[in-house]
């Protein structure tokens, strides 16, 4: 797969489709982009070019642990720089969960570069913030405190990053544990500060100021709650909201975790909704 040097790290990326308006999609958590290939292929069939990439610290891209703002802000600026290198601006930006946070931060930081937002499984609320802060940051800080960078390299996530790009081990081992812990703590604190926001990553005022068209698909689990999606849809002035893509569940009976199989089975419907919004936004409908 092609690679690009972006803001001090090498990013692994792929473009699906050969012509048409540009789209960038990003998965949730720190997962590789590969799960989004089938959805991207469906969009490409309708004449769009889809940019997929592994974010820094994810998949086959380089590790880059830097204490500059939040991790999601770094990811958003990386994607903007990568898309600029490829001549892919402006573009529709989308993603699920962490990828949706990236997309919203991209729009807040680079509004002139965004044609529209394609969002599914938005994250919000105290339960989600506490759970994910531990998953993304606290556990790794504890590993570094107990066993140094050797322990971090042996973790499930970073061992996968090393398997995908062996040079990542040397990059991690070159870090002082104290600096690694400082950055994890900084990123954790930035994440925890979002517990009372409508969604993780944006205030009410910021959401109201996003004027581009938005397709927003609600989740049905305790991390990606329908309440969070409804709040965001009510604040985004040009949002088209869908809460019937996956099984609708009452707010007091949500799944503990999202169901990957359920979401995969709904990809044709997700593609249909995204294509409808993009066709209208580009005048192709």
Label for each model-derived stretch:
Residues 52-91, 257-266:
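Active-site loop/oxyanion-hole signature of alpha/beta-hydrolase fold enzymes
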Residues 95-99, 103:
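Gly/Ala-rich beta-loop-alpha elbow adjacent to hydrolase catalytic centers
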Residues 210, 216-218:
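Short beta-strand/loop motif that positions the catalytic acidic residue
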């Amino acid at each position: 797969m092609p690679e690009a040097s972006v803001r001090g790290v090498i990013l692994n990326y792929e473009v699906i489709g050969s012509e048409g308006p540009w789209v960038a999609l990003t998965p949730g958590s720190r997962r590789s982009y590969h799960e989004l290939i089938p959805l991207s292929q469906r969009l490409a069939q309708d004449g769009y070019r889809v940019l997929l990439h592994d974010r820094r610290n994810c998949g086959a891209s380089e590790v880059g642990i830097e204490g500059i703002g939040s991790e999601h802000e770094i990811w958003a600026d990386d994607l903007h720089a990568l898309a600029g290198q490829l001549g892919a601006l402006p573009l529709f930006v989308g993603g699920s969960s962490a990828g949706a946070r990236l997309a919203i931060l991209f729009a807040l930081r680079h509004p002139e570069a965004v044609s529209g937002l394609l969002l599914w499984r938005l994250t919000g609320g105290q339960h989600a913030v506490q759970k994910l802060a531990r998953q993304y940051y606290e556990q790794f800080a504890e590993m570094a405190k107990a066993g140094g960078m050797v322990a971090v390299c042996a973790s499930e996530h970073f061992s996968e990053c090393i398997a995908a790009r062996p040079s990542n081990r040397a990059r991690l081992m070159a870090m002082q544990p104290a600096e690694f812990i400082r950055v994890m703590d900084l990123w954790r604190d930035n994440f925890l500060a979002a517990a009372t926001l409508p969604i993780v990553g944006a205030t009410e005022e910021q959401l109201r100021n996003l004027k581009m068209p938005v397709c927003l698909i609600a989740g049905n689990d305790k991390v990606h709650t329908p309440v969070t999606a409804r709040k965001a849809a009510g604040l985004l002035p040009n949002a088209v909201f869908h809460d019937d893509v996956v099984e609708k569940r009452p707010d007091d009976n949500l799944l503990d975790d999202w169901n990957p199989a359920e979401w995969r089975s709904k990809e044709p419907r997700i593609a249909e909704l995204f294509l409808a919004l993009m066709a209208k936004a580009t005048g192709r409908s």
